[in-house]
């Protein structure tokens, strides 16, 4: 066999003899060296310096997002039941489109058209203080 082939094939020494030219041993030593950034951590003192205020170095975390509620579980606001009939409520909605100076006339016309015995037989649906037809 050619002696140059022996130079190409490098077998590990397995600790036999002190062969400093063994690349496997050199690679192992390189791996055993500590990380270069680890030096400043190992050289650091065990306790922080006492002359500095620790509150100055606290990092405030950003506010956590609020929990989003499902519309199925949120309660709806309670509507107070007033003594207003459907007729008055509908009339109030109808006069919102009228100009402010003509709302009174528009309200009277609306009530005249809609407050009849066909819509409210025997006054059913109207406030009791209005009486019966």
Swiss-Prot record:
Positions glycosylated per UniProt: 83
Role: Post-meiotically transcribed gene that has a role in late spermiogenesis; required for actin cone progression during spermatid individualization.
GO biological process, one term: sperm individualization
Pfam families: SOTI
Species name: Drosophila pseudoobscura pseudoobscura (Fruit fly)
Protein name: Male-specific protein scotti
Annotated InterPro entries: Soti
Residue ranges of the region described as Disordered: 12-57
Coiled coil spans: none
Keyword set, alphabetical order: Developmental protein, Differentiation, Glycoprotein, Spermatogenesis
């Amino acid at each position: 066999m050619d002696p140059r082939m022996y130079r190409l094939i490098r077998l590990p020494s397995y600790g036999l003899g002190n062969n400093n030219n063994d690349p496997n041993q050199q690679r192992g030593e390189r791996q055993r060296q500590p990380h270069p950034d680890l030096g400043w951590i190992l050289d650091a003192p065990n306790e922080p310096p006492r002359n500095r205020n620790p509150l100055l170095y606290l990092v405030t975390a950003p506010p956590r997002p609020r929990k989003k509620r499902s519309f199925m579980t949120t309660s709806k606001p309670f509507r107070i039941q007033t003594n207003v009939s459907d007729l008055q409520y509908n009339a109030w909605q109808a006069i919102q489109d009228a100009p402010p100076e003509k709302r009174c006339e528009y309200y009277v016309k609306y009530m005249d058209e809609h407050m009849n015995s066909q819509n409210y037989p025997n006054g059913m649906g109207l406030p009791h203080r209005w009486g019966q037809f």
